[in-house]
A protein has these predicted regions:
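Active-site beta-strand/loop signature of hydrolases that rely on acidic residues for catalysis
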Residues: 11-12, 47-73, 106, 153, ...
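Short catalytic/ligand-binding loop motif for oxyanion handling, primarily in non-cytosolic enzymes
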Residues: 17-19, 67-70, 99-102, 173-175, ...
Length: 340
């Protein structure tokens, strides 16, 4: 751990589940991983290098290994931590799902503890439940569910500092299964509508924490950003803007909210096969409440090309490109028992 700071990270690891067998042991062979053109051995070794370089005290793993009939997320991540020789050897998770893409926290038990603390209220039920909202403005209540229920944790440092963390992976807006242009529009709008409902649900839980004066972090893959697609105009605001509101802060999201931003950050890099080119997107965030912001934490996107120090480190740069289609985001927070 860096002197007098905690480092928290969020990292979406593309198809982490494909690297483990039914006993949650890593498969280190030369067969394809879930990543296009990358073997399981190459992805695992790249992930080891990235996690070691992060040297974080806690890492929210989005698309964490599967929990199912035989497999267990906690056991798989513990095995990965041993393989990578990480000090983040403990794992916390909340509600499992059936997508093979879990949400879990790897953390250093010598630095902090993590406890699953799911909440429920009349206007924001527990995240594994059902949220009722009129999505279509047709005076009929729709039932909304999270395919990947957000992870609610209470983090307590050895010095007694308490942070509340919500880790999220919102619904993708991508029009999977579309057959033509009309399908693309219909599915995209339906997916955005559902994602916005998830954002409202999440925002209500956040407001509950903030009303109680909790120091709050909201992190993960929100699958959205201001101005990211043309359908946003139909709904007025992006999911990110709904979640962030006026009382949370993420400097990268703030840049996107500026009407004439010139240099746009990105946390993910995807390949457009139709046009044979890569494109970036800002999808991953670490939002903090006001007292945490006042402590002057430091954000960093571990982008292999945009970060000069990473670009000059060829081994780390290549590892980031092999490990996932997303890049980690870190937050260095002053390790003080009492925040300003």
């Amino acid at each position: 751990m860096r002197q007098a700071t905690y480092r928290l990270a969020t990292y979406n690891v593309e198809w982490f589940a494909s690297l483990f067998d039914d006993e949650d042991q890593l498969i280190l062979d030369d067969k394809p991983s879930g990543r296009y053109g990358v073997t399981r051995r190459a992805q695992a070794e790249a992930l080891r290098q990235v996690f070691q370089a992060l040297d974080a005290d806690a890492i929210l793993v989005v698309e964490a290994p599967n929990t199912g009939h035989q497999q267990r997320t906690v056991r798989a991540l513990e095995h990965f931590a041993q393989f990578a020789n990480l000090r983040t050897s403990a794992v916390a998770m909340g509600f499992a799902n059936d997508t093979q893409q879990e949400i879990a926290l790897l953390y250093d038990p010598a630095v902090l503890s993590a406890r699953h603390t799911p909440q429920s209220s009349s206007d924001a039920p527990q995240f594994d439940g059902v949220f009722e909202l009129d999505l279509d403005v047709d005076e009929q209540v729709d039932e909304v569910r999270f395919s990947k229920p957000p992870l609610e944790l209470e983090l307590t440092s050895k010095s007694g500092q308490v942070l509340h963390l919500i880790g999220a992976h919102l619904k993708s807006k991508a029009p999977h299964g579309a057959r033509d242009a009309d399908d693309v529009m219909r599915i995209s709008i339906a997916n955005r509508r559902k994602q916005l409902a998830q954002a409202i649900w999440l925002r209500r839980r956040m407001s509950w924490h903030l009303e109680l004066g909790h120091d709050l972090l909201v992190m993960g893959d929100l699958n959205d950003g201001p101005g990211l697609d043309e359908y946003e105009a139909l709904f007025g605001r992006s999911s990110v803007e709904i979640i962030m509101g006026e009382d949370l802060y993420d400097p990268h999201a703030q840049i996107l909210c500026q009407p004439r931003a010139r240099s746009l950050p990105s946390t993910a890099r995807f390949f457009d096969r139709d046009n044979e080119r890569y494109f970036g997107a800002l999808l991953d965030y670490i939002m903090v409440s006001q007292r945490l912001r006042n402590a002057q934490p430091r954000w960093r996107i571990w982008h292999p090309f945009d970060e000069a120090t990473i670009y000059r480190d060829a081994a780390l740069r290549d590892a980031l490109l092999l490990a996932s289609d997303h890049f980690p985001v870190t937050l260095d927070v002053p390790a003080t028992a009492t925040l300003p």
